[in-house]
C-alpha cells in the first residue's frame, strides 16, 4: 500500500488510523488526501504514541478546540508540547501562555517566548528577561510588545551573552544614556561596537566619530561611514576612500557630504571592484572627461556601463550610441533609447524595429511615434514605416 495513492477509501483510511502498529497510524495521520472526522482527530490527539500525536498536531488539518490546546500544552512529552507551541492557528488563553512560558523544556519556553499573539504580563516579561538560559533571554529581548524599564535595559545591555546584548542594542523603544553609548562604542567585542554604531538615538561626538572611523575592524569602520549625522572632514574622506577594504571604500564613495577631488574621482572610477566603479559612475559632483566617459562605456562590467549610459552630463558620440544599441543586455539598450540627446537615424530605427527582444521593439516604436508627433524625421530618412 502506497501513501502516494490519492484514491484510498474511507475504510482504508479508518483501518490505517486504528492499526495496532503506531508507525502505520502515524503514516496515515500524515496522509494528506482526506479530511478527518472529529472522532478521528480526537482519537489521534490522544493516541498512546507520542509520535502519532505529533503527526496529528503538525498536520494542520483541523482547528483545535480550547480543550485540545489545554491538553496539548500539558502533554507528557516535550516534543508534543513543542509541536503545539509552534501552531499559529489558535489564540492561547492566559493560562495556556503561563503553562508554556514556564515549561521545563528549554525549546518549548523559547518557542512560547517567540509567539506574538499574546501580550505578556510584567511578571512574565521580568521572568523571561532573567531566565537562566541566554536563548530565552534573547527571545524576550526581541519582543516588541512591552516597554522595558531602565533597570531591564541596563541589565540587558550588560548581559553576559553577546547575542542578548545585541538584541537589546537593536531595540528602538528606549533612549540610551551617554554612559551606555560610550561603553558600547568602546566595547572589546567588535560586533557590539557595530551594533552601537548603528543606533540612531544619539549624535556622536567628534571624538567618537574619529574613533569609529579608525577602528581596527573594517565592519565597524563601514558602519560609521554609513552614519549621516556627522560631516566628514577632508582627512577622514581621503582615509575612507583609500581604505584597504573595498566595502569601506564603497560606503565612502556613496557619501554625499563632500565634493570629490579630480584625483579621488579618477581613483574611484578605476577601482578594481566593479561595485565601487558603479558607485562613482553614479556620483554627480563631477563632470567626467571624454576619456572617463569612454572608459566607463566600455567597462567590462555591464552594470558599470549601464550607470554611465544613465548619466546626462555628457553628449555621447554616434559611435558610443551605436555601441550602446548593440549591448547584449536589453536593459542597457533601453537606457540608451531613453536618452534625449541622440538623433536616431532611419537605419537605427529600421534595425531596432526588427530587434529580437519585444521590449526593445516597443521602445523603438515609441521613438518612431514621437518623431511622427513632432513632425521630425530621422537624419537620413526618406520614408518611414507605419506603426
Which stretches of residues belong to each language-model region?
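Alpha-helical scaffold segments
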Residues: 2-387
